[in-house]
Design a protein with these regions (language model features):
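Bacterial N-terminal signal peptides that target proteins for export
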Residues: 1-9
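Pyridoxal 5′-phosphate
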Residues: 11-13
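C-terminal motif of bacterial Sec signal peptides marking the signal peptidase cleavage site
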Residues: 16-19
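Periplasmic peptidoglycan-binding/tethering modules of Gram-negative envelope proteins
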Residues: 21-100, 174
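Solvent-exposed loop/turn segments at secondary-structure junctions
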Residues: 75-78, 107-111, 148-151
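Extracytoplasmic/secreted proteins, especially bacterial periplasmic and envelope-associated proteins
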Residues: 81-88, 114, 118, 122-126, ...
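A non-catalytic structural micro-motif
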Residues: 97-106, 121-152, 165-174
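Short beta-alpha junctions and helix-cap segments that line functional grooves
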Residues: 153-157
Length: 174
């Protein structure tokens, strides 16, 4: 990688991390209801850092809802438009050490079964490396390839094939 590419990649990661910050509004305490203890669990993932992402944010936070990363034909290189989402998922993992994610790599139907399984794995590894590069821990990430076995679209057209060239980020609880 030449220096210009590294500089552009570093700038993209910095912008992506800045885009994932969450504004926290100060709310005065209204009623002293039942207290929650630090480290209490919500959905199996410890809620150890108040004011940061919680498991419910996986459904409500727009950058965390982006859980499908698409790829170009026969490529395992990440597109720039997915860098912000990847940085957001990395931040979630940093804030939640008990969280785990699977990178499920997929390919379209073109190519042999073996080739597509390898391509799906390379794509999953590319997303995993990007998440780790943004601060996610390798111990929190698993990669599995389904190759062409789990298409989201069954037509034989470029539009359909482009939907099948993907990595799905699936959160699990250990």
């Amino acid at each position: 990688m030449n220096n210009t590419t590294r500089l552009v990649l570093a700038a993209t990661v910095c912008v992506a991390l800045g885009a994932c910050t969450k504004k926290v509004k100060e709310v005065p305490p209204a009623d002293q209801g039942p207290a929650t203890t630090p480290g209490a669990t919500t959905g199996g993932i410890p809620d150890s850092t108040p004011g940061r992402y919680s498991p419910s944010d996986l459904e409500t936070d727009s950058c965390l809802r982006q859980r499908v990363i698409y790829f170009d034909f026969d490529q395992d290189t990440l597109r720039p438009e997915f860098q912000a989402a990847i940085a957001c998922h990395a931040k979630y993992l940093r804030d939640r050490p008990a969280a785990r994610m699977n990178m499920e790599g997929n390919a379209d139907e073109r190519g042999t079964r073996e080739y597509n399984l390898g391509l799906g794995e390379r794509r999953g590894n590319a997303v995993s490396a990007a998440v780790q590069g943004s601060g996610g821990a390798a111990s929190q990430i698993s990669v599995i390839s389904y190759g062409e076995e789990r298409p989201t679209c069954a037509d034989s057209s470029e539009e359909c094939w482009s939907k099948n060239r993907r990595v799905e980020i699936v959160y699990t609880v250990k």
